[in-house]
Curated annotation (Swiss-Prot):
Record family assignment: Belongs to the PPase family.
Class of this enzyme: hydrolase
Alphabetical UniProt keywords: Hydrolase
GO molecular function: inorganic diphosphate phosphatase activity
Source organism per UniProt: Ochromonas danica
Subunit structure: Monomer.
Protein name: Inorganic pyrophosphatase
Catalysed reaction equations from the record: diphosphate + H2O = 2 phosphate + H(+)
EC number per UniProt: 3.6.1.1
Length: 12
């Protein structure tokens, strides 16, 4: 999945 943080970075 993927999650968007406050900075808008996606983490797999």
């Amino acid at each position: 999945x993927y999650a968007f943080g406050i900075n808008g970075t996606x983490r797999i």
